[in-house]
């Protein structure tokens, strides 16, 4: 296919038009008085959202050169979302400001490479300063503030704070759609995995359709068990203790399963069998986690352990196990706290090293199950459109809260960026590098300016006053008052602000140093001239 090429100023201007179109659509959502954007969907009702990255991903422009610029800024939002989970609109606003200011200077004859070095120098200082003024997050109230600011909803803030308090900072918090109108929290204590009972004959509570085992022993193996002879040594010892047994195995079938069911129906012995969770290496890791949590051992021939020589000392224990048709929950496992802590630290180390998103998700799940539990926020709303919008906001709030726990918080509403203004301005640089520093200085004013404009105020006046205010004092666009932002609960996670600034600078530097753009040439419509004559057809 033939290509079309644009060079230097013409190429950069075309990209800037695309940057502006995307950024202008995204930045109307910034701040407490930001508006929503309606996105057309090919199927179903339109999506109404104020989530920057969702809007950015939807935008596709007709002009291929403009589209390149738009896609580069969408990349800023996407990357910030991947790292921090929030702050995508801020990142877009920063990128637009840097690109716009940078191109003005390049058009006036500045060297793009010099500007790039200046931008990188300024951002490095800005990031260090943001970390220096960051405050660690303390207690449930601070967590609620971060979540409430991100979701623009006090109730959501309280819900997320309660979820994190219940399952701990390493716990898994997931979102589900509720059947009703209200948004509520459901917490699963202990370790839960997605495997239920095989036979309904194992149920102990017919009303709830679940098998509840009080103070059971837990046999953990990766084997397929078909002969009762293999299980007998362990079964006899458990029966003598008069306690129930949970068997977690690859499968229990034939004679072994029949014997367990018959004994349960006769009331002589209560044993519930569930399939081992996961597959392959992941199954081995999960069985090992269950063993550590319950103080048992994985009976595996790979490890030189055989079922027929299993003693009661190799079995795990828990205060309670609840088995439903689809899940098994182990509450208060009797594992050694030192072993559990060591396993948690090992998973954390693996999390730092992994580059796969899938592996990261699975490691996070394992960590949560060992560390405390799983919380489910069931999101409710009156209509499907509102439900989607609410779910996106809660997801952002959740990510924002995790980022705050990780790297602390700073003053919100763009105030943290304004508080580092003087430190960045003090950087010693000359020529085009100094121009790069000035571009970053102008860009870090932009979030405050945009928040004020979205609230119907003159942004420049707010920016000028902020430059002379004490650190931490900022403008509350929701009430129109000047307040201590952290005391007022208007906070932003440092990780979110830092990521937004770094990603915006990275893409801005790429656009400024672009000298040519290559795109596909649109095909001309050749019409139907070569169609054969259809004769007398109607």
Swiss-Prot record:
CDD domains: GroEL. Its EC number is 5.6.1.7. Keywords: ATP-binding, Chaperone, Cytoplasm, Isomerase, Nucleotide-binding, Stress response. ATP binds at residues 29-32, 86-90, 413, 476-478, 492. SUPFAM superfamilies: GroEL apical domain-like, GroEL equatorial domain-like, GroEL-intermediate domain like. It catalyses: ATP + H2O + a folded polypeptide = ADP + phosphate + an unfolded polypeptide. Forms a cylinder of 14 subunits composed of two heptameric rings stacked back-to-back. Interacts with the co-chaperonin GroES. Together with its co-chaperonin GroES, plays an essential role in assisting protein folding. The GroEL-GroES system forms a nano-cage that allows encapsulation of the non-native substrate proteins and provides a physical environment optimized to promote and accelerate protein folding. This is Chaperonin GroEL.
